[in-house]
Design a protein with these regions (language model features):
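N-terminal amphipathic/basic leader segments beginning at the initiator methionine
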Residues: 1-50
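Catalytic cores of large soluble enzymes that bind and process phosphate-bearing ligands
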Residues: 26-29, 47, 51, 68, ...
Length: 97
């Protein structure tokens, strides 16, 4: 396997890519817990999802969005699994995207 080569500027060094990480108050530690990566144009995308029978709303909605192999943004949170939120969780995940 090839060594990883870090690029100055990180992911935003790629033309058309914007990214941000913020403190949304999900984690009690007060650390950054929400990220957004945005492409100015739809891009080829692939993902690996859990095989667990109980999938959180964000996983289900993400599977819907990436079905055609394209994406324009990634929203990622940490500190809360968002599992077993029912129909409201699906609604909330769709609203975010």
């Amino acid at each position: 396997m090839a060594d990883v080569q870090w690029i100055d500027g990180g992911i935003t060094a790629v033309p058309g890519i914007l990214a941000a990480g913020v403190i949304a108050g999900i984690k009690p530690s007060g650390k950054k817990d929400l990220a957004l990566i945005y492409s100015s144009a739809p891009a080829r995308a692939a993902a690996v999802f859990t095989t667990n029978q109980v999938k959180g709303a964000p996983v289900l909605v993400s599977q819907e969005h990436i079905r055609d192999g394209r994406a324009q943004a990634i929203v990622a949170s940490s500190g809360c699994s968002n599992v077993c939120t029912g129909e409201q969780g699906i609604k909330d995940a769709r609203e975010i995207t």
